């Protein structure tokens, strides 16, 4: 099986992507946000989409963890990922390794 990238949700301001990594059976979440499009209201909207749609979608496919790897020097990205419930568990090659059990 090859690595597969799938769009889980997309609108004008945000793009939730998911990588299914072959050989290790894990999911890596990517969150791309249009610059200047972020607000507390949008966070609440996207957090709800993550909790109510994306997590159940992944659970239904027998995944029990979600991973993210923001750059070490991107503190904003790390804070944002923490807001979605992921926590840091290590660092490697300039990346912060984060995960959430679902």
What are these regions (language model features)?
Residues 3-17:
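Conserved beta-hairpin
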Residues 15, 76-89:
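Low-complexity, intrinsically disordered Gly/Pro/Thr-rich segments
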Residues 24-40, 96:
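Conserved acetyl-CoA binding element of GNAT-fold acetyltransferases
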Residues 66-78:
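Conserved beta-strand-loop-alpha-helix junction that forms the acyl-donor binding cleft
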Residues 87-99:
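Conserved catalytic-core motifs of GNAT/GCN5-like acyltransferases
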């Amino acid at each position: 099986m090859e690595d597969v990238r799938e769009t889980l949700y997309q609108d004008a301001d945000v793009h939730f992507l998911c990588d299914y990594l072959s050989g290790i059976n894990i999911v890596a979440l990517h969150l791309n946000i249009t610059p200047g499009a972020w607000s507390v209201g949008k966070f609440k909207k996207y957090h709800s989409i993550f909790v109510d749609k994306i997590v159940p979608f992944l659970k239904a496919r027998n995944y029990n963890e979600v991973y993210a790897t923001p750059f070490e020097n991107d503190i904003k990205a790390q804070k944002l990922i923490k807001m979605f419930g992921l926590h840091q568990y290590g660092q490697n090659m300039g990346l912060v390794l984060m995960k959430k059990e679902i």
